[in-house]
């Protein structure tokens, strides 16, 4: 059995995944090496299981978003709260008890509940539309209780507040009885409900990590077999914790992912590298750096590129138009000259369109780029050269008053990876001319076999293989024509991507992985 112990932790509390409303403006970059590896094992029908250490009341929707809902899961918090064989139900607003004098105010973001003219509660929803949490307020408008809902349709835990500050959190069982209490204002000490003392070794713990360690150890003693292999995505929250908990004779694979483990952090990971048997590295330049930093451990380091198999390969050839996706990055500012080059190419080239894509941009930022694009068109390009054919909006008679003139460019503001996946479905070419190309856009491009044009060399794009590297934005037109004029070059990029994906996601990779593991287990005598 292969066990994956994911590094899905929150930004504020170590053992808690963030519970954030769907409309929060930061781009949710959730994809990581664990999703890539789970899918790899699933496709080859290799027995694997997720061991989730963190508190994740919305775990099922999270796994569903990434296409791994069918994965076998053991959740420590489910065990701690005695949540076994739970019947999933959809929780509606009317399922919750409200006083008869409550008024409900609906907004596009949340439902505010008023009582006697004052805010009494706020009901938040998750990305998928389920009730994710409810905040209750006192007469002074301060938060008094925060109910966190499980995505299976019940209250998972309640945070109680004292003068607007979190005091303690009760973790509930299916009957709504608290099993254990985490004192948030007292260093996180944990108190077990004496009624359930028989399920724990003690009634008081210094912090939640001791409770997790106890149940993790209990699980290993019950389920673990000698030949099991543990895949650990490296994370400062859990590396040492896991190496301390896992028996020394088990095979441990450490996995590095650039969005979680920057190259600057490699020098701090020596203890993890020494205790791991195999280290999987997501980028070739990272592999080289590690071999230079740790020559005595170089045999442990191996390369595995991440791919997101939620994307479908080669869909753009089903469309007459060549759609170009242009990556906006407001943190670097908007390059007017780059916009001009792209718009000029669209204006001069038949059957081409461009999508300007941003991640969780503000309304002001989107208005700014739209205004700049319109300014460039008015001043340097004729609007009529960017017009599509006339659209009569499905009208029976193509009268002049029914006609709508569409333009060959559009703006898309995306909140998460699924939005980008949807946007890229029929895209022929990705253009990212930022100083630091967006990591997930590059991974998505390779995964979908879409060639990319960049100003900066990266490990994900190889010149004339699966992309085009330009030294100046004025070279954009030449690069774009290379991939849009004929299908030959575009097909070559697709074939190159398919070969890369096969190398890192199919039987070819698993044979290599088994070989690396065999080398280790032979040494250990397993």
Describe every region a protein language model picked out.
Residues 202-212, 216-237:
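Short N-terminal targeting/anchoring amphipathic segment
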Residues 430-494, 499:
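Catalytic binding pocket for nucleotide-activated donors in carbohydrate/polymer assembly enzymes
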Residues 272-298:
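A short, active-site helix/loop in glycosyltransferases that binds the activated sugar's phosphate group
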Residues 416-427:
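Short acidic alpha-helix that forms the nucleotide-activated donor recognition element
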Residues 284, 309-394:
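Conserved catalytic-core segment of nucleotide-activated headgroup transferases in glycan assembly
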Residues 388-393, 405-416:
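Active-site donor-binding acidic/aromatic loop of nucleotide-activated sugar
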Residues 487-521:
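A charged, aromatic-enriched C-terminal amphipathic alpha-helix characteristic of glycosyltransferases
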Residues 217-224, 259-279:
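Membrane-proximal helix-turn-helix segments that form the acceptor-binding/catalytic region
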